[in-house]
Amino acid sequence: RQHEGDITNIEFENGIFSDGALFESGLAYADSDALYLSRPGSMTTFQVTIGYSNPVVESCQTNVLVYDRGGKNAVLTDASSVKAEVALNSAILTGSIGRTGDFLLITDEQGYRTAAAVYSTKGEELFKFSSSELYIVSGGLSPDGRTVAVLGFEQRDASLISHVRFYDVSSGKQISDTELENALGIELCYLDNGSAAVLCDDGLYLVTRRGSSEHALTVGTSDLISVATRDNAMVLAIRSYSGGARSDLYTVRSGSVYGP
């Protein structure tokens, strides 16, 4: 693709930023002061003051979520306005946004280990699960926003057992609970076929809502370079041991693994 002039360039407002995500034809990015929505040509189209210590940005086609990791606040916007502001009583560990704009926040709870809560585009709490036994590390929403998957682990005797649980958002009912023995969960992505891609310290698992699991790819943590999730798909960059390549890229979508 050919580019003319600086049409693909975006100049950051303060020269640096903490996190960013693709949004519409440009970029949503944040520093400790604000969230910015910018288009190529260095044009900032929307700006929200946040004042976060550690901002994290997630996006879908129509909305942008920014939350303060380690803090207690989150903001949801569209391309031109703030849709919801959430102020919590507990510190946010991680979060994600679904295709519908509904979003998930995982928090460190007093009296419990962790909690996972789903919020609507209006900031209303739609679902919450908390546990004193399970430490939740990741989660994601289905494309239609009707179900949520959470990844966590528990200590059983001398072992750490990872769990992948699916819940119905409206009723709060647990659909399934799949144990991944001898695997420590790192990241979960809810795929668009209704299953979950689960990255663990020994590789990638595919877990269905019916409770079945498949060890689809063996990857050691020392070989994992990076992982990213977006639009109900996961991408893995793994150290390569073949030819002159430095890394292999794998894409996980619709319940299948593609690559390298």
Task: Describe the predicted segments one by one.
Residues Q2-F12, G41-T49, S80-A87, E124-S130, ...:
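A short beta-strand motif characteristic of beta-propeller blades
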Residues F12-L22, I50-T62, S90-R99, E133-P143, ...:
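Repeated scaffold domains used in trafficking and secretory/extracellular systems
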Residues D68, I106-D108, G152-F153, C200, ...:
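Recurrent small/Gly-Pro-centered beta-turn motifs in extracellular repeat architectures
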Residues R209-P260:
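Intrinsically disordered, low-complexity segments enriched in Gly and acidic/Ser/Thr residues
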Residues Y112-Y205:
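Solenoidal tandem-repeat scaffolds enriched in leucines and small polar residues
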